[in-house]
Every structure is written in structure tokens, then in C-alpha cells.
Amino acid sequence: MKVLPKRQILKRRGFTFLLARLISNWGYKNLTKAHVEFEEDLLDLKKRGSVLLYTGFHRSLWETTGMLSALNLNKLPIPIVGMGDNLIKGKLFVTLAKNTSIFLVKRGKTRREIVESAKELRSNMYSFMAYGRDVLLFPEGTRTGIPRTGEYGGFFPTSFDALLEFEKEKNSIDQNMKGIKILDSYIVPFNCDYSMIREASELVGFNSEKPRTLKVWDSLKMLKNIKDVFITFGKPVKVSEHLEKSRKEIAVMIREHCLDLVKILPVNVVAFALTESLNNGKSDMASIYKNIESVISRLNDFRDRFRGFKDFEPETMFITVSKSIPEFRKPSADKLPIYKLYADYIGHYMK
């Protein structure tokens, strides 16, 4: 019989959590126009008895609260969120984070620290699953994968390792322990696509030498309407059906599922066209419009992933995007890092 160590399973009672939920839901309703898609009925899956690990690519700090509101307002339980401890500093903020169901993932600097962090994450994930607590994680571990390399980062396998172990051992866990819930575990891939990334300039290190990492509290100064956000929850993957796979194979599989959920928005098309035009030394609008048509044509096999297109006419599309994002109004080579950021979000479709 496996006896779990007594752990502090984060509680959601009290003023702090209720206030955080209220503010998050208010921002979700008033500072975005969210479009949510479910490829399967997650509410029904929860009712049938399951514990879920939500995983997806990390683009913006908005996801750490916005995804929770998307689930909460669709009558799904709010998951515990994993967040790098480099984003929250100070005893007060750490306490507030824990009271709002955030668990901190240590960002190790040395090899030893990284190994210890992985062990702690694995142990926490195992306990959350055993206590029936849904979790939301970003296995990339950073928002700077795209701005630094032009590609989405790989998924760290540690959290998936915990789920594999849980599924193999769950029937041997002492169920007499208070709060233990032995449920079927699922991994739910998700993706969040933005018509405007609120911290885009900071992510690409605009007017600086390299990208810088924003602290979570810096996001308060970025309170702005980010317009259309497209959230997609993919088909849940039942972990017990993949026990023959290694944790790395699971990580690769889930990453591929997340890539397939990426939507193509007008801003991505215009950005890709601008990047190609400016890299070829062409900044006249006629060349840019022609390139927009070319990009749309090359994406024809993925039209089922187009979202937010009211008009495919290049000039109309460019005007719509430039009204939302100032850097697009007067295309110039010095703004290429911004254009490339939005273009690279759909780069895997253009290969």
C-alpha cells in the first residue's frame, strides 16, 4: 500500500481567492473578446470522474489568469497553476500566490538545482493527481521560445512522468487518507492565439539587445484591451492508454497536439507578409498586399484553422490589423522583430 506524504494541498477559501477570481473574470469579460472552442465535452468528462492536466504553449502572462476564467465561466473547476518562481518575489506575493492556487516551480540555475526542481515538480504533480486536483502547466517553461529561436520550445517531460507513475500505481495508493480521489487522468492540450500580444515589445527586446522576462506584477501596467483571443481545448488524452510510452514520447506527442491547435489570425498573415517583404527590401504597399495574397494561398491546406477573417482582401486585412497594433501602421525594417514574432507563431504551417 503506497502512503502519500502529507502535503499542503492548496485551498481556495477566503477573501484572497474570491477577489482574484472576481478580478480575473472581470478582465476576461471586459478587456478581451474571447472565443472558446472545446473539441470534447470536458464538463461531461469531469462528471464521469477524471483529473485533468491542461498543457499548452506559453505566449503571454495573460494565459495564467485568462485560461482559468475561460474554464471557470464554462462551469469547469479552476485548476491549480504552475508558475516559475522567478516571476514572483517577496514573502507577501508568494503568500498571495499560494492563496490563489498557484504553485511555484523552482527555476534552477545549476545542474543540481535543476534536478532538485524536477524532483519537486514531479512529487507535487503526483500528489495533485492523487487528490483529484486539476493542474494547468506550460511545459515549455518560458514565453521566450518564439522570440529567441523563432520556434515553439520543446516540452519538458517531468510532469508527464508523474502522470505515468500515478496511473501505474494509483490502485496501490492508500485511499483511507483524507482527500484522496483515485480518478482516471487525462492530458488536455490547449492553445491560446492572440490578435495582440500585450507584452510583445518586451518579449522581443524592442529597443534593447535581448528579450527580458517580465515579472507577473509588471502585467498590471499592461492592463489594456487585447481584443480577440482564440482559446482551443483539444481532445483529452487518456494517460492509461499510453503507459507503454516513455515520458519523452508523451511530451513529444502532446506538443504535436498543441501545434495542431494553433489558429491562423489576420495579424499572423500580415506579419508573415511584412517580414518576407522587408527582408527582400520591399516596403511599398503594392508588394506587401501581393505578399499577403501569397501567404493566404500557401496556407490553403490549413483553412480550417483560420479565425477572425472578415475579409480576405489584402488592403482591408492590413488596415484592420494596423488599427489594433501601432507598429503595423507604417511598416519599416526597424520593427521587424515585432512582425517576426507574430509571423513565427504560424511558422510551422509555412514549412
Task: Say what each PLM segment does.
Residues 1-351:
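Membrane-interfacial terminal anchoring regions of lipid-handling membrane enzymes
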